[in-house]
């Protein structure tokens, strides 16, 4: 297992040394571009240069499509990924919906933990929205060489379940 620090683009000291003030996990309520002020729930900040890195939310299944079933996890950050360490059991199967960078990284970690892994990507190829075809081909081969099954061009319509646990995917 590698430490979380190795996953960050820069160490925390980089930001301090370069006089960059990080404000993480805040909800910005208002930006005044004329006065160069940012208003959050509790504090107002002034700024010289503003860089918005808003992150994103994972695609969620609509309605009751699996929301109350055990075994469905959404991953968007390191804390989400850490929670999976507890449930990864060698020999179990991980079905990963989404063949972007986060999904492929999850697949790699699951294989390192000796899980059987299937990645389902609804686009025509993995990394379709973020990389060229050659990059997709490289990562497809890398994952397949490490026994990850990749299914492209198919989405998931529904789960079947019994006693609150998934027992089929269509």
Language-model segments: residues:
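Glycine-rich, phosphate-binding/catalytic loops in enzymes
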Residues: 1, 67-71, 113, 136
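Short polybasic/polar patches that bind polyanions
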Residues: 16-18, 111, 144
């Amino acid at each position: 297992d590698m430490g979380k620090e190795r996953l960050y683009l820069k160490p925390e000291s980089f930001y301090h040394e370069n006089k960059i003030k990080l404000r993480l996990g805040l909800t910005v309520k208002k930006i005044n571009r004329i006065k160069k002020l940012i208003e959050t729930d509790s504090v107002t900040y002034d700024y010289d240069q503003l860089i918005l890195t808003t992150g994103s939310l994972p695609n969620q299944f609509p309605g009751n499509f699996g929301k109350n079933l055990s075994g469905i996890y959404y991953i968007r950050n390191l804390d989400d990924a850490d929670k999976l360490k507890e449930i990864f059991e060698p020999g179990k199967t991980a079905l990963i919906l989404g063949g972007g960078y986060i999904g492929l990284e999850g697949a790699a970690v699951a294989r390192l933990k000796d899980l059987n892994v299937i990645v389902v990507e609804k686009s025509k190829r993995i990394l379709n929205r973020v990389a060229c075809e050659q990059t997709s081909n490289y990562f497809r081969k890398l994952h397949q060489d490490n026994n990850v099954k990749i299914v492209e061009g198919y989405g998931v319509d529904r789960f079947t379940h019994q006693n609150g646990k998934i027992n089929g995917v269509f």
